[in-house]
Amino acid sequence: MTEAEIRDKVYDIIVSKMGVNKDQIKPESKFSDDLGADSLDTVELIMELENEFDVQIPDEDAEKIGTVQQAIDYIVKK
């Protein structure tokens, strides 16, 4: 899977889980500050990323994922 394909899937997950428009999402968007996620939203988003991409994201790594690009980069590395 290419980085572009991963990015598109991550964007789709954010749209479905957080109820934002795709055009509101930018790589530098912060889940909490820019996209309005609370802590539960963030946990659900991480769980959905794990399911979609078949990766395990330990809590200590999940805490470091604060932007859309950080999520994409993490998945690309796995």
Swiss-Prot record:
Entries under InterPro entries matching the protein: ACP, ACP-like_sf, PP-bd_ACP, Ppantetheine_attach_site
Residues covered by the Carrier domain: 4-78
Alphabetical GO biological process terms: lipid A biosynthetic process
Superkingdom, taxonomy of origin: Bacteria
Pfam families for this protein: PP-binding (PF00550)
Pathway listed: Lipid metabolism; fatty acid biosynthesis
Post-translational modification: 4'-phosphopantetheine is transferred from CoA to a specific serine of apo-ACP by AcpS. This modification is essential for activity because fatty acids are bound in thioester linkage to the sulfhydryl of the prosthetic group.
Entry's localization field: Cytoplasm
GO terms under cellular component: cytosol; membrane
Swiss-Prot/TrEMBL keywords: Cytoplasm, Fatty acid biosynthesis, Fatty acid metabolism, Lipid biosynthesis, Lipid metabolism, Phosphopantetheine, Phosphoprotein
Molecular-function GO term, any one: acyl carrier activity
Modification O-(pantetheine 4'-phosphoryl)serine, positions: S39
HAMAP family: Acyl_carrier (MF_01217)
Known function: Carrier of the growing fatty acid chain in fatty acid biosynthesis.
Family label: Belongs to the acyl carrier protein (ACP) family.
Protein name, as recorded: Acyl carrier protein
Source organism of this protein record: Chlorobium luteolum (strain DSM 273 / BCRC 81028 / 2530)
The encoding gene: acpP
